[in-house]
């Protein structure tokens, strides 16, 4: 963060305020900064990066830009009228849960992470991340307005659902702990004291970074596990040729969430590799807590599956299968972070293999006149062509 300096340095220099600033006039080499809690950013420049992977993720997210209105839901409205009460319960409950998750993600990164980011490429990736989450929330509204005769029947009942509220507490706790602690730190003398090498200031900043670490892990779990029971249910309807437009939209959302999962994985990986020595210590100290976070999430998602299928199964899907699927997904996410699997499900034995083509939209081949093409990438040009790139080609 920025050192405390005199408000006015000279008649020819802009004042540099204490604390956070929207534009830092100090010359800062961002390649030498940690990802978080460094000096505030100044010029938004995207020509050199400490971690190019974050710029690649920005480009990928921008290339995948889409709008829900591109997908027709005309058939979904009539399909919904043919669903059984149990199927309607599954479809509507999952929509409510997805609305909760993306309402959190639609503002969470901007409130908790972006104010303390110290690298322009990471700031950029997170800004696009938050924007895409807004697209997701608008997508749920688009589905609800087209499928239900009265959208208020869904929206107004979200906060009345005890199962949803129970999810909200576990999803938002780590976010709220970080946001409140960071705000207190930023508005008190702790912000200035953080630049002094004293035990108190170092301890306070380390504990704040610990909350940041937990929040990033929490989001990794949210993006990587919490969506997947509802994803599987949406895709199951699509497999039955029901609610296909909604399934297509959820497939687009899942593609974006995969990018956001990768973003959190890359942040955690950089910490493990020593981006911030304090974070290396914190990562080692938090290993058992991370495992507990994964266990709690898996247990909650199993409970959610039980709730969804409390009235019976649907063709190709039931609560027991979803239990195994959640364990399978959790093992994969743990392995990506360098942890051993927690559950007795082989990493290559997907209990719901038919979900793969929905999660990997690039693998779908659709005739343009039949359905919306979702594998199209906007601005997908290769820009690293060198002088000798075509040396072996002849006309």
What function would you assign to each model-found segment?
Residues 2-395:
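Non-heme di-metal
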